[in-house]
A protein has these predicted regions:
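Alpha-helical segment of the N-proximal tetratricopeptide repeat
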Residues: 47-76, 132, 136-144, 368, ...
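Residue signature of alpha-solenoid helical repeat architecture, marking inter-repeat boundaries
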Residues: 48-49, 82, 87-89, 124-125, ...
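TPR repeat positional signature
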Residues: 54, 88, 95, 130, ...
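Solenoid-like repeat scaffolds
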Residues: 79-80, 162-164, 205-207, 236-244, ...
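TPR/TPR-like (Sel1-like) alpha-helical repeat modules
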Residues: 85, 92, 96, 104-123, ...
């Protein structure tokens, strides 16, 4: 997709926002900064001087999860210096999508082949040997090893290297990333692993303010409600460190969304989407860099009261560069489903087309349809939706288990939510509240998804509908603690405070909602806030 084909999203005022963030985030190249704006990486090797800049560019790309381009760049180094062992290590690492997906047997075999090639070249320095040995621990040929086993072996090797080389920014940053990878899968030790990663990265962030991996991994390490504030400095830096990376332009939004900084998130993701589209045009990146940014962009528009802009993002899914028609339809269906539920447009949610979505997002669409039907009073439609969702969840969990992902042992949150609203529609309020409370507690324990409707907010909504505002406002307060500045959290808290006779509390929440949304907001509920504030 060329920028002139972005339809309404790239016209008029929005064109300003698409183009300027990229220019504004680029560092001044006259000061001696590298020509590729990917951050400063010093990665000494025994390879020839000719390929050393290529190696460092490839490592910088690796730190920003630009895996396709990183692999190509390492391969280029290997072509120009066939004895460069670390280039083979790099090609293996570019196959290891640590936070995105588990490598299958084919990928493990390909990675192991590269590591064996690196070992045969007998790298000259202990540092190179260390990186290659650590990667070998992950790619080792043991079919019975689980993914977590491989991560633990890899992380343990990096921990030893970092202890032997304290302050080494490359060993330290890769070690911290391995801890975040473990935290994503080893739920019993998640908090401890994240805390260790943060403790490793904090001093490195001060010592190496332009290093892409340190800032990037700090954002991932702190991507939970209780840690998000610790990641704000890294979030503010990362896009400026590596403005030529679409992922670097997007990643700050993980923290901005956690902290309810909607305008920051919007600017971040508009820039990331434009950069991702350009990279896809050049065949340097896959389409998901665009769609992931659009996911966060849509959510941020909704939370800042900009319904029309959120709907433009749905339409923009038709123009994602490099995506198949099936992928475009699936992404569009997913965004439409979340939008309908966020806006409480129950008829719209219940009428969402299912066939248009691809398998990955099918359960989200059916979840929205089931809740929409239940809240719209269509019991038959809700029951059918819940039944279909239960099957989709079972299939999803089978695929997940087959791929090596560890299950939580808990009923899926989306299924609990749909079942709860069905029970509520049937008049079984105690059962409904019990289901939502269990879903909310599970979500809170695991950090919750940053761009989804919190189950606890649904619980608060249900309590308010049951005319139990004192209980509802307690739940809304918890929602706003974990997900600050959520539109419906603030609106629900204001309504609950008003229902309990707390005029000062209602005024405070309505005022906060009006401030968060600003002049460009168009959600009709804002009229309620303005009317209340005008009366006071």
């Amino acid at each position: 997709m060329h920028r002139h084909r972005l339809s309404t999203l790239a016209s008029g005022v929005l064109f300003f926002f698409l183009v300027l963030p990229l220019a504004a985030l680029r560092a001044d190249t006259s000061s001696g900064a590298p020509p590729d704006q990917l951050g400063r990486v010093n990665f000494p090797t025994s390879c020839t001087a000719e390929v050393q800049p290529t190696i460092e560019k490839a490592v910088a790309l690796l730190h920003s999860f630009q895996y396709t381009e990183s692999k190509k760049t390492f391969a280029d180094a290997s072509t120009h210096d066939p004895k460069c062992a670390i280039a083979h290590w790099g090609k293996a690492m570019a196959l290891f999508y640590q936070l995105w997906e588990f490598p299958n047997d084919k990928t493990l075999k390909a990675g192991r082949k590269e590591i064996e090639a690196a070992q045969k070249l007998r790298p000259a320095t202990p540092r190179e040997q260390g990186f290659i040995t650590a990667a070998a621990a992950f790619f080792q040929k043991k079919s019975k090893m689980t993914h977590v086993d491989r991560l633990q072996a890899y992380s343990a090797a990096l921990e030893r290297l970092y202890r032997e080389n304290p302050g080494d920014v490359e060993f330290g940053s890769f070690y911290a990333l391995s801890l975040v990878s473990l935290a994503e899968e080893d739920h019993d030790n998640e908090i401890a692993d994240r805390q260790k990663a943060i403790a490793t990265l904090e001093p490195l962030l001060q010592q190496h303010p332009d290093h892409p991996g340190v800032a990037h991994y700090m954002i991932h390490a702190t991507d939970r409600p209780e840690f998000a504030a610790q990641g704000l400095e890294a979030a503010r830096r990362y896009a400026a460190i590596a403005p030529d990376s679409a992922h670097a332009l997007h990643m700050p939004a993980h923290i901005f969304v956690r902290l309810g900084l909607w305008q920051d998130s919007i600017a971040s993701n508009i820039a990331a989407n434009a950069s991702g589209a350009h990279a896809a045009e050049m065949h340097l990146a896959e389409s998901h860099y665009q769609t992931h940014a659009m996911d966060f962009l849509s959510y941020s528009y909704l939370q800042s009261g900009q319904e029309a802009k959120a709907r433009e993002v749905i339409e923009h899914a038709n123009h994602v560069v490099g995506a198949s028609e099936e992928m475009k339809a699936g992404d569009r269906a997913y965004l439409a489903a979340r939008t309908a539920v966020e806006l409480h447009h129950w008829k719209e949610a219940a009428a969402l087309p299912v066939a248009a979505s691809r398998e990955d997002w099918q359960s989200t669409v059916v979840w929205a349809r089931a809740i929409g039907a239940a809240r719209g009073g269509d019991l038959a439609g809700a029951e059918s939706g819940v039944k279909e969702l239960a099957q989709l969840v079972a299939d999803r969990e089978k695929r997940s288990k087959k791929s090596g992902y560890a299950g939580s042992g808990e009923k899926a949150t989306d299924l609990r939510e749909a079942e709860a609203w069905l029970a509520f529609a049937k008049g079984k309020s105690d059962e409904a509240l019990q289901e939502l409370r269990a879903a909310a507690d599970h979500q809170d324990k695991n950090g919750g998804e940053s761009v989804s409707v919190p189950a606890r907010e649904m619980l608060a909504d249900m309590l308010l509908e049951l005319k139990r505002p004192s209980e509802a406002i307690a739940e809304y307060r918890t929602v706003l603690k974990n997900s600050p500045n959520r539109f419906d959290g603030l609106l629900g808290a204001a309504r609950s405070a008003q229902a309990t006779g707390d005029a000062r509390g209602a005024q405070s929440y309505y005022a906060q909602l009006a401030q968060v949304c600003g002049a460009g907001a168009d959600r009709p509920e804002l009229a309620e806030a303005k009317t209340y504030l005008a009366q006071k």
